[in-house]
From Swiss-Prot:
Species of provenance: Yarrowia lipolytica (strain CLIB 122 / E 150) (Yeast)
Keywords for the protein's UniProt record, in alphabetical order: Actin-binding, Cell cycle, Cell division, Cytoplasm, Cytoskeleton, Nucleus
Keyword Amino-acid biosynthesis: no
Single GO MF annotation: actin filament binding
Full protein name: Cofilin
Length: 153
């Protein structure tokens, strides 16, 4: 079913569409750097991926604290880190699929089947992280993933 808020190209196999404001928020993060993270959720009607929260914190721990312990979310974080070779700081956009073990099975299923439509719509993501518990999205784990080959960029 076509929804006037969303473009057909951002419809997932599950029938969940990416709301245009979700894409606009990402483009503002990517281009304007006004926010450092966006947390997305599937709305209660299970028809759209929408922005749940945007933040400007410099603290990765604050961002992690926004992820619910018992439900799924998508997120984008502007991950800034130091290059170990002394070349200074780098920043990479990281896409998170947060699907904790304690989330309801139905929620996990709809988030899994809707992820690709959002992920394809967000151009400029350098790293993708799947998290089922907080250890998988810990700063050190993400740093290891984003810094692979950082000296060659």
């Amino acid at each position: 079913m076509f929804q006037p808020c969303c473009s057909k190209s951002t419809m997932s196999r599950s029938g969940v569409a990416v709301n245009d404001s979700a894409l606009q928020a990402f483009n503002e993060l990517k281009l304007g750097k006004k926010v450092t993270f966006i947390i997305y959720k599937i709305n209660d009607a299970k028809t759209e991926i929408v922005v749940e929260e945007e933040g400007t914190t410099d603290s990765y721990d604050t961002f992690l604290g926004k992820l619910p312990e018992n439900d799924c979310r998508y997120a984008v974080y502007d991950f800034e880190y130091e290059i170990s070779s002394g070349e200074g700081k780098r920043s990479k956009l990281v896409f998170f699929t947060w699907s904790p073990d304690t989330a309801p099975v139905r929620s996990k299923m709809i988030y899994a089947s809707s992820k690709d439509s959002l992920r394809r719509a967000l151009t400029g993501i350098s790293t993708e992280i799947q998290g089922t518990d907080f250890s998988e999205v810990a700063y050190e784990s993400v740093l290891e993933r984003v810094s692979r080959g950082a000296g060659s960029h």
